[in-house]
């Protein structure tokens, strides 16, 4: 709590100040909004409940508004946390600021009295623990506490009515508070002061109840037992310290006031208002909303509390709004259903006998017989003969349900192959697949290598059974042996598992592929139930009888197999990792509670002693307990329906203690089952959908409701009535009050509670004849009381436990112990009637249903129903329901009938199916719409000659325009030489640098990164070098280089590198150490490119395709350009006939030559001149570029199966993903040298679907003949909106700061560097005395990045909407799209035209305002090399880039020198068009020297490359749209330096050769040339001279292009050659001949 700012004087009234401050500090529920509750505290409350349903309710209350970290235990009694949770609460609250109030004698006196009461309670508690109390003393204490409680006057009539029930609630709270008091350290002061009065003011009324005594002696999760003596001493010490603390007194006084404050002052209300208030509150109580007894210290304005949803509510209007919420309605229905299930009466002997008969008949009908088992064994023997003929070293064995006898008649036959270690698992199964396919004994032979356990599936021709053949599945075989041994030892095990499996099959929850549970998990669930019930039928496999066994280190004990069919063998191997984990857990426990040093020493000695231990544990109990099969079946359903919290605990059959999810580090979601031999993974993880889990829980409830109620052959009348009553309750929407929620409206007084509690402690005396029926009624009464506890107090009963391990034990112990006498009597009765004699006949199949029903008919008629005054005093509706059901139990036995019917058990609801691919419900993985392999591809029309020529030219144009010229290659070599000399001089003279990657492999773009590898002479590899230190030292040296900037060492990567940027060229590069394998990779790619020119053409086309679709950046979750080049090479190798050979398969001899590099064989055939001699058929493929490009798209969309095969260029034979063990990856691309490197490993399924969608759309676009407008072909074919359906590439895995994958936003290096600069700026401002905004920069929030753009490098800004660098989200063109579309920009454009027209002659070519061209969705390339900062180039260079400079004011002269960052908008990053300028061949004006005019006075028409951006057809009078050079794909507007004298080619019809210069917009795309439309840039006057006319020179592209896009200067440029300028008539004539509008226009 924050300190009050209004408490300036001690004369202020405390009450008014408290309420004022609390109303300011606390957020409460109002009439309009309900605020979310803290998830962490809700989960802590869930941990304190062993009941699955109650924990589920808590999870549904995650939207609660209260802050439970500092919740008052006395006010919010519905969710009182356990001691561990309270410790967390106290720790959180101890950091809050205490609110100070003026000291007063009254408050001091109250604090002293409170502390005295606390000391008195402590002494009484110590005495109570030292000496047991007699029943009389217990009753006396209960009476005194009841009298003390009754002295308090209720604040309202409603409170007076619910006083007795609230009494029990408060007594239970105080009992828990006394127990919690032992564990509260003295450092926690915030809540101790709140609860001390509650602990010490009154005695515990239920301290000696059996449940309380068990809780006091149980063990918590950390393994520390509650020592009573030490606990008393700790509490007394803490209380003595609190007595001297003034802050404790003040806070205690504050809490005293708040607790004594009245929630609603009824004295100020009129009688009519009080009556209306009472009626309204009675209506709210029906929906479990009650008025708070005392004012909440945290929610002072809240008057009501919903005990069902645990939400504080401000007033009645807010309560009515909360009642209408779906969450509240759902919780009410679940509460009602749970209460009704708990109120069901116990079964009668006839009922249990009928259940036994139903289970036995099911086992006989659907279970396998000895003959079926023999048939399955013969199948295994026959298959063993077939396989061992080809693989003699292998052997086959039967495992699974066929061997355990848990199989149904239609179950599969599981066969496992044992093979020697020298054999490979994938190769073995592939061979077995081929063997079985060739054999006539088996049909429908298929492979399922992508399953959790890879298998070969076939069907035996003779028997028709389905066989699943696996290999090396040793763990499953061990589990099978265990279950088989248990089935032989315990006769009820097999029929129970069969009934459970058949029930799961009927409900369709055993299908693992559709999101269900594996079938053998149900056997483990039955085994777990038989271990946990009281008394147990099966022992646990590990326990305290093993010397040195610790449940915390249970993973050190490993089960090794079954010995003599009676024991399980175990070994203890204490691993270092386990020891570290246990030490960490012990340290964590130490922080909560101090441990004794002697105990730690003993534990260490035990851990050392249990190393390398082994032994065996029995599988059967010494004295087996016999229970009827029907009773076990009903208890099994009840156990998993009501008793066991599935979402909280782990089903573990190894130990007796309940294992929590925290012990296994498994998430608290759905069902967790541990395999006893494979303990690391959850075998029920296939149930990964909450919808399926809720469906499973619903089926459990439906099954328990059906089998717990008496059923007849003609239909269950009682069940029908029961459902009718349930529907009536729901339709009336009048749920019972929370106080009376126990058994549908039972009001239980405190006297009745005392009587029943006393009767629980007394042994039950009964005769042999009427023992069963009498005990049933007593159990029913106890059940009523238990249900009252759960319903009346919400979560009180579940929160009274002191540890997770003790939460479930009292419930199981109490209920199962009460059933023990009835089990004995029932066994004798059943033995007399010869129904099921489990002690004599181990085979339950020998009894028949007819004998059971006929013999038990007489016994059921002699039952006597005994009554109990404590039960009959509860005159409630639940008792009437129970009596109705008891009347139905007295039906003749022959009328009781149970059947496993699908409609009954599923309630007619279809199963919930969840796809394992997309994780969506409603379909299976075979019908998943997101599976691109399921898309029906329409056949493509035949290709025409004209369309083929267009595709050829488009592919060639990709290479011509994007491949780096020779001059750029030369400049890259010069940069490398300069760096090498500098490093040799400054760092190490033995350093050698070499280029690799895109600079040398023949597939590099212009402005591609510089990939440099550094080696040191005298070292063949980096084994003896400290690579991290070398990289860091190299980064320090490179920072001294004047020509480099942005030096960044990255030492945490797989290959440590140093990143840098070359100032002059703007190229980015990285230096790696001994990346020699990549050099060989580069050489091989260059060799492939030199074999056939079509390889390079297709490689460049593929890279352009990937860039346009935004699927070519591995750092953002897609594939790298290197991976796409490998895809091109693989296609050309697999083409028939092939275009290129497999270089790694061409060698002399039978063995591949060895050229080992970094542990891998880097051999490939590199003698290209000898290829034609070795492979005469190499040049047989004569397909054109267009045909090959379309064939590539069709190959990867129609033929290649990404799921089954790997893209591998090292072999011609198909390589399967199963052979590489890459079945879990969506795309598998093998590195040709590093065979363990999958280039598609980082691609998610969502990104795979996006990539395949682009390929499918590309197949349709490039395969459908269409003739776009002249010069618009590239724009048509590479339209990203068409290729990606207008969608953005998935970026859910990308960092929001830098747009990369592999780290979270908090760990982003961009953010860290920005934070460092911010702190540095703050320190400078502090030194200068500027402290204005210093505090706002201490913590950086990504949402405030735009606030710091004035002093940041624009390259550090990155928009996570479009992914572009240089701006943030607020300034993104995508965000401004809607406003730009709706706003009228004609006037603003007109002003710009006027300003641009007034430019002085000789001024620089200015860059206009921001273009209104909208950024496309896929134009979000993250390559920083596409947007380098503009740099001034020396004037001795051969060319000069036409760098546009923004002008701050119209008509102002631009500044000379490099451009300033502040002069341009943050989202526009300027970029030079050409990196390496050359000297002009002719004279030029002095303006050229200042960088204000292009180098050549002559504007040369260049070929059009309008691949980027949409085309805007401007209306008459509209202004031009200027190009933004920050666009990453501006490279498409940079023509390469190519000869300009290529003769023009003509196609079908007349193709124009000229285009008006002013008819181009944006990236060179052709637009309309209407009156008033101006070009991209204002005309440049040539020294006030008239514009000359030149003869037209043939262009390098048969279509015209704006002269401003021509490459300025060329190595083969002829300066004296005249040129003609182009007019607008050509474009008009072209548009008249081609009336159809072009593709890709965004505006008309």
From Swiss-Prot:
Keywords: Cytoplasm, Magnesium, Manganese, Metal-binding, Methylation, Nucleotidyltransferase, Nucleus, Phosphoprotein, Repeat, RNA-mediated gene silencing, Transferase, Zinc, Zinc-finger. It is an enzyme of class 2 (transferase). Zn(2+) binds at residues 306, 309, 322, 328. One of its GO terms (cellular component) is extracellular space. It comes from the Eukaryota. It holds the Pfam family MTPAP-like_central. PROSITE patterns: ZF_CCHC (PS50158), ZINC_FINGER_C2H2_1 (PS00028). CDD domains: NT_PAP_TUTase. Its EC number is 2.7.7.52. It catalyses: RNA(n) + UTP = RNA(n)-3'-uridine ribonucleotide + diphosphate. Residues 253-333 are annotated as: Required for interaction with LIN28A and pre-let-7 RNA. Residues 628-678, 1184-1237 form the PAP-associated domain. Changing residue 309 to A: Loss of LIN28A and pre-let-7 RNA binding and loss of pre-let-7 RNA uridylylation. Interacts with LIN28A in the presence of pre-let-7 RNA. Interacts with T2BP. Interacts with MOV10; the interaction is RNA-dependent. Utilizes two multidomain functional modules during the switch from monouridylation to oligouridylation. The catalytic module (containing the 3 CCHC-type Zinc finger domains) is essential for both activities while the Lin28-interacting module (LIM) at the N-terminal part is indispensable for oligouridylation. Belongs to the DNA polymerase type-B-like family. This is Terminal uridylyltransferase 4. It comes from Homo sapiens (Human).
């Amino acid at each position: 709590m924050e300190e009050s700012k209004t408490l300036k004087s001690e004369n202020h009234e405390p009450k008014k100040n408290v309420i004022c401050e609390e109303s300011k500090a606390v957020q409460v529920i109002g009439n309009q909004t309900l605020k979310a509750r803290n998830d962490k505290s809700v989960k802590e409350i869930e941990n304190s409940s062993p009941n699955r349903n109650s924990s589920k309710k808590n999870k549904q209350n995650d939207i609660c508004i209260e802050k439970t970290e500092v919740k008052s235990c006395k006010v919010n009694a519905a969710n009182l946390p356990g001691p561990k949770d309270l410790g967390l609460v106290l720790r959180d609250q101890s950091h809050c600021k205490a609110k100070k109030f003026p000291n007063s004698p009254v408050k001091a006196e109250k604090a002293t009295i409170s502390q005295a009461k606390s000391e008195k309670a402590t002494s009484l508690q110590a005495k109570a623990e030292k000496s047991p109390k007699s029943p009389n003393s217990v009753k006396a204490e209960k009476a005194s506490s009841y009298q003390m409680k009754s002295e308090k006057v209720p604040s309202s009539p409603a409170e007076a009515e619910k006083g007795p029930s609230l009494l029990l609630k408060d007594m239970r709270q105080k009992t828990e508070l006394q127990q919690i008091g032992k564990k509260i350290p003295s450092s926690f002061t915030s809540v101790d002061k709140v609860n001390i009065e509650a602990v010490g003011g009154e005695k515990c009324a239920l301290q000696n109840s059996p449940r309380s005594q068990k809780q006091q002696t149980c063990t918590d999760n950390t393994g520390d037992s509650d020592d009573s003596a030490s606990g008393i001493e700790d509490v007394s010490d803490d209380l003595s310290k609190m007595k001297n603390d003034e802050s404790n007194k003040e806070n205690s006084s504050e809490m005293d006031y708040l607790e004594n404050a009245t929630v609603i002052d009824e004295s100020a209300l009129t009688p009519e208002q009080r009556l209306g208030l009472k009626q309204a509150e009675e209506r709210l109580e029906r929906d479990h909303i009650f008025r708070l007894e005392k004012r909440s210290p945290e929610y002072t304005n809240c008057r009501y509390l919903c005990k069902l949803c645990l939400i504080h509510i401000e007033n009645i209007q807010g309560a009515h709004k909360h009642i209408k919420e779906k969450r509240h309605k759902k919780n009410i229905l679940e509460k009602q259903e749970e209460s009704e299930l708990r109120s069901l009466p116990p079964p009668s002997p006839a009922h249990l006998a009928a259940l036994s008969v139903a289970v036995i008949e099911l086992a006989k009908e659907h279970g396998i017989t000895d003959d079926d088992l023999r048939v399955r064994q013969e199948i295994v023997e026959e298959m063993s003969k077939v396989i061992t003929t080809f693989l003699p070293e292998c052997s086959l064995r039967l495992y699974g349900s066929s061997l355990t006898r848990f199989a149904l008649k239609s179950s599969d036959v599981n066969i496992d192959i044992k093979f020697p270690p020298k054999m490979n698992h994938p190769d073995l199964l592939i061979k077995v697949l081929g063997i079985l396919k060739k054999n006539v004994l088996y049909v429908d032979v298929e492979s399922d290598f992508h399953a959790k356990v890879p298998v070969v599936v076939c069907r035996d021709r003779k028997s028709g059974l389905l066989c699943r053949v696996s290999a090396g599945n040793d763990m499953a075989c061990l589990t099978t042996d265990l279950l088989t041994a248990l089935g032989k030892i315990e006769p009820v095990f097999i029929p129970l598992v069969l009934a459970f499996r058949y029930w799961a099959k009927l409900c369709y929850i055993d299908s693992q592929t559709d999101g269900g549970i594996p079938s053998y998990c149900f056997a483990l669930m039955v085994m777990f139930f038989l271990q946990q019930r009281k008394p147990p039928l099966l022992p646990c496999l590990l326990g305290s009888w093993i010397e040195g066994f610790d449940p915390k280190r249970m993973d050190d004990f490993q089960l090794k197999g079954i010995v003599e069919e009676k024991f399980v063998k175990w070994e203890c191997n204490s691993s270092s990792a386990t020891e570290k984990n246990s030490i960490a857990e012990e340290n964590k426990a130490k922080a909560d509670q101090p441990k004794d040093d002697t105990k730690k020493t003993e534990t260490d000695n035990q851990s050392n002693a249990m190393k390398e231990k082994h032994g065996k544990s029995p599988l059967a109990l010494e004295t087996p307990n016999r229970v009827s099969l029907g009773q076990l079946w009903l208890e099994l359903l009840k156990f998993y329906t009501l008793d066991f919290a599935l979402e909280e605990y782990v089903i573990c059959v190894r130990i007796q203690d309940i294992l929590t999810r925290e012990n296994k580090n498994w998430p608290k979601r759905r069902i967790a089952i541990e395999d006893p031999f494979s303990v690391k993974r959850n075998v029920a993880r296939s149930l990964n959908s909450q919808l399926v889990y809720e469906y499973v829980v619903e089926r459990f409830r439906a099954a328990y409701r059906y089998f717990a109620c008496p059923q007849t052959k003609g239909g269950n009348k009682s069940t029908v009535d029961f459902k009718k009553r349930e529907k009536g309750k729901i339709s009336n929407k009048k749920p019972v009050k929370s106080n009376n929620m126990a058994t549908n409206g039972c009001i239980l007084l405190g006297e009745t509670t005392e009587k029943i509690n006393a009767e629980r402690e007394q042994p039950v005396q009964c005769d042999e004849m009427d023992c069963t029926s009498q005990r049933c009624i007593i159990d029913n009464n106890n059940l009523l009381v238990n249900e009252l506890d759960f319903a009346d107090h919400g979560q009180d009963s579940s929160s009274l436990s002191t540890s997770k391990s003790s939460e479930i034990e009292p419930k199981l112990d109490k209920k199962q112990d009460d059933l023990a006498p009835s089990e004995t009597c029932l066994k004798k009765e059943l033995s007399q009637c010869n129904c099921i004699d489990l002690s004599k006949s181990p085979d339950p199949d020998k009894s028949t249903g007819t004998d059971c029903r006929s013999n038990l008919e007489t016994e059921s008629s002699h039952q006597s129903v005994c009554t109990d005054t404590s039960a009959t005093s509860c005159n409630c509706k639940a008792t009437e329901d129970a009596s109705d059901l008891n009347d139905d139990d007295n039906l003749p036995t022959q009328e009781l009938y149970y059947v496993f019917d699908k409609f009954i058990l599923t309630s007619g609801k279809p199963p919930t199916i969840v796809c394992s691919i997309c994780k969506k419900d409603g379909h299976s993985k075979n019908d998943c719409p997101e599976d691109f392999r399921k898309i029906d591809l329409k056949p493509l029309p035949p290709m025409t000659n004209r369309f083929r020529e267009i595709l050829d030219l488009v592919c060639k144009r990709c290479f011509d325009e994007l491949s780096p010229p020779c001059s750029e290659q030369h400049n890259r070599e010069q940069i490398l030489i300069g760096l090498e000399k500098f490093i040799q001089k400054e760092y190490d003279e033995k350093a050698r640098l070499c280029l690799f990657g895109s600079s040398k492999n023949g597939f590099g773009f212009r402005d591609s990164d510089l990939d440099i590898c550094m080696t040191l002479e005298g070292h063949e590899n980096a084994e003896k070098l400290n690579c991290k230190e070398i990289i860091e030292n190299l980064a320090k040296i490179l920072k001294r280089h004047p020509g480099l900037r942005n030096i960044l060492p990255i030492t945490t990567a797989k290959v440590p590198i140093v990143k840098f940027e070359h100032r002059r060229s703007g190229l980015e590069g990285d230096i790696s150490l001994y990346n020699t394998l990549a050099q060989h990779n580069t050489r091989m790619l260059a060799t492939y490119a030199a074999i056939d020119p079509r390889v390079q053409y297709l490689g460049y086309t593929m890279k352009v395709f990937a860039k346009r679709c935004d699927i070519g950046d591995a750092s953002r979750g897609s594939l790298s350009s290197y991976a796409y080049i490998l895809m091109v090479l693989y296609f050309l190798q697999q083409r028939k006939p092939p275009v290129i050979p497999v270089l790694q398969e061409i060698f002399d001899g039978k063995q591949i030559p060895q050229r080992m590099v970094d542990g891998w064989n880097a051999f490939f055939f590199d003698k290209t001149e000898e290829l034609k001699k070795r492979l005469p058929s190499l040049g047989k493929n004569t397909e054109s570029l267009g045909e090959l490009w379309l064939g590539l798209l069709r190959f990867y969309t129609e033929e290649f199966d990404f799921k089954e095969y790997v893209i591998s260029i090292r072999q011609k034979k198909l390589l399967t993903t199963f052979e590489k063990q890459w079945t879990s990856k969506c795309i598998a691309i093998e590195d040709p040298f590093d065979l363990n490197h999958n280039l598609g490993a980082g691609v998610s399924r969502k990104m795979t679907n996006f990539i395949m969608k682009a390929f499918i759309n590309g197949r349709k676009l490039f395969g459908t003949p269409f003739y776009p407008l002249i010069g618009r072909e590239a724009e048509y074919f590479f339209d990203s909106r068409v290729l990606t359906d207008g969608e953005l590439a998935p970026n859910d895995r990308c960092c929001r700061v830098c747009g990369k994958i592999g780290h979270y936003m908090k760990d982003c290096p961009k953010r860290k560097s920005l934070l460092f600069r911010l702190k540095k700026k703050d320190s400078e401002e502090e030194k200068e005395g500027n402290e204005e905004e210093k505090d706002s920069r201490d913590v950086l929030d990504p949402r405030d990045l735009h606030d710091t753009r004035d002093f940041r490098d624009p390259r550090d800004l990155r928009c996570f909407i479009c992914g572009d660098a240089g701006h943030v989200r607020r300034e993104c063109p995508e965000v401004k799209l809607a406003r730009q579309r709706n706003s009228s920009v004609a006037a603003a454009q007109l002003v710009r035209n006027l300003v641009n027209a007034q430019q002085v002659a000789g001024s620089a070519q200015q860059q206009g305002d921001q273009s209104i061209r909208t950024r496309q969705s896929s134009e979000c390339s993250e390559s920083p090399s596409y947007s380098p900062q503009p740099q001034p180039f020396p004037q001795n260079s051969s060319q000069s880039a036409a760098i546009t400079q923004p002008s701050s004011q119209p008509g102002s002269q631009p500044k000379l020198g490099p451009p300033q960052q502040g002069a341009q908008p943050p989202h526009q990053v300027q970029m030079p068009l050409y990196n390496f300028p050359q000297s002009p061949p002719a004279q030029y004006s002095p303006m050229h020297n200042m960088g204000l005019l292009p180098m050549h006075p002559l504007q040369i028409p260049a070929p059009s490359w309008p691949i980027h951006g949409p085309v805007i057809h401007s209306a008459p009078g509209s202004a031009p749209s200027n190009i933004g050079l920050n666009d990453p794909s501006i490279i498409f507007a940079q023509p390469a330096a190519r000869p300009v004298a290529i003769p023009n080619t003509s196609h079908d019809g007349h193709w124009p050769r000229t285009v008006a210069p002013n008819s181009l917009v944006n990236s060179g795309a052709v637009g309309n040339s209407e009156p008033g439309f101006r070009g991209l840039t204002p005309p440049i006057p040539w020294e006030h001279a008239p514009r000359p006319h030149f003869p037209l020179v043939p262009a390098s592209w048969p279509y015209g292009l704006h002269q401003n896009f021509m490459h300025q200067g060329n190595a083969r440029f002829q300066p004296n050659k005249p040129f003609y300028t182009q007019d607008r008539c050509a474009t008009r004539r072209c548009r008249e001949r081609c009336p159809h509008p072009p593709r890709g226009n965004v505006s008309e």
